[in-house]
Amino acid sequence: MEEYQHDNSTTPQRVSFLYSPISSSNKNDNTSDTNNNNNNNNSSNYGPGYNNTNNNNHHHQHMLFPHMSSLLPQTTENCFRSDHDQPNNNNNPSVKSEASSSRINHYSMLMRAIHNTQEANNNNNDNVSDVEAMKAKIIAHPHYSTLLQAYLDCQKIGAPPDVVDRITAARQDFEARQQRSTPSVSASSRDPELDQFMEAYCDMLVKYREELTRPIQEAMEFIRRIESQLSMLCQSPIHILNNPDGKSDNMGSSDEEQENNSGGETELPEIDPRAEDRELKNHLLKKYSGYLSSLKQELSKKKKKGKLPKEARQKLLTWWELHYKWPYPSESEKVALAESTGLDQKQINNWFINQRKRHWKPSEDMQFMVMDGLQHPHHAALYMDGHYMGDGPYRLGP
């Protein structure tokens, strides 16, 4: 016993292996520095002669896994105490077995967290691989070409010609690559659920294409009607739309018209309010051209008969001026006028009748003599005979 006590008195005190609380790491650094400077000071929470090597190792582990701090077990100062806080009559430091078990628990929790992280990454990779596998099944399905065609048909509706050409070329290129790379799918490896999905999706795309096509066709028909109406009004063909091949419909136009329209904008001529009447007239002329031409000729002949030659009219006007007081030619004078003018008796009679109605008004003496002649036919006869005897002024008989 004396030798054992002597050894204890000469041997320095051993270090306590108890762990400090995780939340007090900064405090541990300060206390470890103090213990290195003064090994005989017993005021430290970790006991005399505490070395800061363990504390530095724990601090390094926390720096490596900062996101795992919430998963580590929380300890308190009441769970782990230093040797000088416990009653010890012999003043010898006591070693507790909780240190080794706490170290094992710490590493087990850390490894469990790492394992959970790896499992989450593996699950994400599995999800990505599942999506890629499903895509490969859809592409290798026999109905995929039908599905692709229905989808591209929907994209072509209302698209410009260059876009339609690019879509068609892309589809042909894709089908060529699929025929070279995709193996044939056996009947045993087919998925009934995938087959049902492909059929339903193809039907949905076909119906969607029909719904898109209907308003486009109605709009095209409306524009064609507008074109025809504008063409009828303007007497020239007007084309609002272009052919599917991108060329203009106005193939028969001259080079000057094509150069004028090369700007891309269609200039509409001014609308004539009488264009509709002219269109109707042209239509009737085409339908009744023979009858109208004969009728026109007949009407022109009648007009020519009603209009006397200029020389004949001049001779009749000369006789009219000489006999203005009483412009009634006798039968002999009518014959003479007919021979000189080349007209017939009917034309001469009609000309004098119209001329007297329009340009002659008898004087009051003439009106009185005419009225008196109605009462005395003998005087009227003398007047008429004396009037036509010469071209000079005449007297009335008794």
Curated annotation (Swiss-Prot):
**Pfam families found in the cross-reference section:** ELK, Homeobox_KN, KNOX1, KNOX2
Recorded hits in PROSITE patterns, A to Z, give: ELK (PS51213), HOMEOBOX_1 (PS00027), HOMEOBOX_2 (PS50071)
Source organism per entry reads Arabidopsis thaliana (Mouse-ear cress)
List, as start-end ranges, the regions of compositional bias called Low complexity. Answer: 23-56
Q: Which gene encodes it?
A: KNAT1
The organism that produces this protein has a lineage beginning with: Eukaryota, Viridiplantae, Streptophyta, Embryophyta, Tracheophyta
Localization of this protein: Nucleus
Q: Which GO terms describe its molecular function?
A: DNA-binding transcription factor activity; DNA-binding transcription factor activity, RNA polymerase II-specific; identical protein binding; transcription cis-regulatory region binding
The protein's matches in PANTHER family, at most eight in alphabetical order, are given as: HOMEOBOX PROTEIN TRANSCRIPTION FACTORS
Induction of the gene: Negatively regulated by ASYMMETRIC LEAVES1 (AS1) and ASYMMETRIC LEAVES2 (AS2).
Q: Which domain of life is it from?
A: Eukaryota
Q: Where is this region: Disordered?
A: 20-61, 78-102, 241-273
Q: Assembly and interactions?
A: May form heterodimeric complex with the TALE/BELL proteins BEL1, BLH2, BLH8/PNF and BLH9/PNY. Interacts with OFP1, OFP2, OFP4, OFP6 and OFP12. Interacts with CCT7 and CCT8. Interacts with KNATM-B. Binds to AGO10/PNH. Interacts with BZIP30.
Q: Which CDD domains match?
A: homeodomain
Bias type Polar residues, positions: 87-102
What's the protein here called?
Homeobox protein knotted-1-like 1
